[in-house]
Amino acid sequence: AYEMLGAHPVTQDGQEMWHFAVWAPNARAVSLIGEFNQWDRGKTPMQKVYDGTWEVRLPAKTFDVKSDPKRYDYPDAAKKLTTYKYCIQAQDGTWQDKADPYGFAMQMRPDTASRIYDLSGYRWGDADWMEARKSYDPYHSPVNIYEMHLGSWRRHKDGTFLTYTEIAEQLVPYLKEMGYTHVEFMPVMEHPLDMSWGYQVSGYYAATARFGEPKELMALIDALHQAGIGVLLDWVPAHFPRDAMGLRRFDGTPCYEHPDPRRGDMPQWGTHMFDYARGEVNSFMLSNACFWLEWYHADGLRVDAVTSMLMYDFCREPGQWLPN
C-alpha cells in the first residue's frame, strides 16, 4: 500500500513530479497544503479517484527554494518547503489538517507536518549480512539481545539527543565488546510525546526526526549489520494516539479505529485500537511491517501489546468491551 499512497517522486512526460495520494473515503473534499502554498486549502485541491482515494500531482520544482529565491529567503527554507498535510473536509463541512499516514518523514516535534522524502538512493553495504541471513537458524544459534531506547541510551552533556550517526559510532563497538548478537530498538517510528518512548506512534512510516534523517537510520542499521549485529524493531500495531493531526477520525469518521468505542477505545492508555476487520487497515499495518523489513533491512519485529489485540477485556471494566 505504501507504494501507492503517500508522497512519491514520479516522472510524467519527461517532467519530475511529486504524486500525493491519501485514503479518506468519507471526505467531502481534500486539499494538499504546505509551506509551498502558504497552507492555503483553496490552492491545491485533490481529486477523488477510486475507493475513497484522493490524489494530486505537482512539479518537483514546486518544493525547491530555487523556484522563488526571494520568497524563500529565510532560515531552513529548503526543509520547510518539503512540509505538507492533507486538509480534509468532513461530511458536516468542518475542516481538519492531517499528517500523511504513509509519509516517509515528519517534522521534529512539536511541529506535526509530514515531509516529502525520497527514500531511494541509499547505498547499502550489508550485502554479506543479508545473504547470510537467508540461511540463519535462530532456533539453533546463540542469541543475546540488547534492548534499548535511542533517546535515553546516551545523550550529550547538555541533555540533547545523539544523532543516528553518533549512535552508530558509539553503539557498534559497545555491542561488540559486550558480546551481543542483536539489538532491539524501542520504536523508532515518529511519535509526538517523548514520555511514551515511542509506543504511541503518529507516523508509522516515518523514522523519528529526533535523531536525524531517515537515511541516517538506514546507515545506523547498515553499520550494525556490517559489524555482524542483527537489528530488531519494536512495532506497535495495536493502538494509536488521539492527536488531532493523526489517524483519529481521519476524514471525520472512524477510518483506522473501530467505530464502536467498546472495541475502538483503550481507556487506560487514552488511545484508539485499530479496526482489524477493515481491509484498508489490514493493508496499512501489513504493508508497514513489510516496509521496515524491506526498506530499512530490519531483521525482525517485536510486536507490542499483543494481549490487547487478543483479549478484548484487557484493561477494560465491565461494559467497556464487546466479546468476540
Predicted regions and their residues:
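The feature marks proteins involved in alpha-glucan
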Residues: 1-19, 48-147, 152-159, 166
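Beta-strand-rich interaction surfaces with strong enrichment in secreted/lumenal proteins
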Residues: 43-47
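Substrate-binding/active-site clefts of carbohydrate-active enzymes
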Residues: 107, 127-143, 149-324
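Short, well-ordered turn and helix-capping elements at secondary-structure junctions
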Residues: 9-11, 36, 60, 189, ...
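Short beta-strand elements bearing conserved aromatic residues within extracellular beta-rich modules
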Residues: 30-32, 84
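Short proline/glycine-enriched turn/loop motifs at strand-loop junctions of beta-rich domains
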Residues: 23-30, 39
